[in-house]
């Protein structure tokens, strides 16, 4: 991750009824609760949960994690099921739902897709604020009767993915999934909006080769790396094969075949 000056943030309650929750989030994230005229982002706590808003006249609007409605709900209902490229990349097949470690969870979109297909997914996110958004989204998902069974298959860990993988305790994931932060060519409004949040807070994953090395050491069956379609492979071993879509590519590093069980 790049080492740039950290942006200024403050926590804001959107209503009087959310003041106590805002205080708890401010304490937990180590952020000021009072208004800051020089803040670049506001962490807002409202009736609909946690969201982050880039401040200023050209703000793209708030970013939050919502697995119940919006894009995640649409993809869950109409996204193509096990025929999706991500499903093929991680090895979803009839009778096979691999255990997946999503080591670059972000806002959890890919992890949710895999969990909706029946995979047990452990998500790791190292940026505390992004992890907080994801935690909040998962908590709300667990209260929805339609989405709760999917959210129950998702476990969130905070921390540095490479360190967690090197010190992994217990049964290894069958698949480690990586989607390192690189300059994205996707021009959709949603991606551009999220990138404006992620870039200042997270930066690019310049340690991607170390992540790949740790993933290859941990995964029992395969490592999958999501990349922009025309981007070079991550420095290190070459993938066994790739699956290519319109804007993205999945580089697959197989170790052994996934079996039913």
UniProtKB/Swiss-Prot annotation:
Main location per the UniProt record: cytoplasm
SUPFAM superfamilies in UniProt: S-adenosyl-L-methionine-dependent methyltransferases
Record keywords, A-Z: Cytoplasm, Methyltransferase, rRNA processing, S-adenosyl-L-methionine, Transferase
GO molecular-function terms, A-Z: rRNA (guanine-N2-)-methyltransferase activity
Function: Specifically methylates the guanosine in position 1516 of 16S rRNA.
GO CC terms: cytoplasm
Reaction catalysed by this enzyme: guanosine(1516) in 16S rRNA + S-adenosyl-L-methionine = N(2)-methylguanosine(1516) in 16S rRNA + S-adenosyl-L-homocysteine + H(+)
Compartments reported by the entry: Cytoplasm
Protein family per UniProt: Belongs to the methyltransferase superfamily. RsmJ family.
HAMAP family the record matches: 16SrRNA_methyltr_J (MF_01523)
InterPro entries: 16SrRNA_methylTrfase_J, SAM-dependent_MTases_sf
Organism annotation: Pseudomonas aeruginosa (strain LESB58)
Family annotation (Pfam families): SAM_MT (PF04445)
EC number: 2.1.1.242
CDD domains (UniProt xref): AdoMet_MTases
Keyword Methyltransferase: yes
Protein residues bound to S-adenosyl-L-methionine: 109-110, 125-126, 179
Tagged with keyword Acetylation: no
Protein name according to UniProt: Ribosomal RNA small subunit methyltransferase J
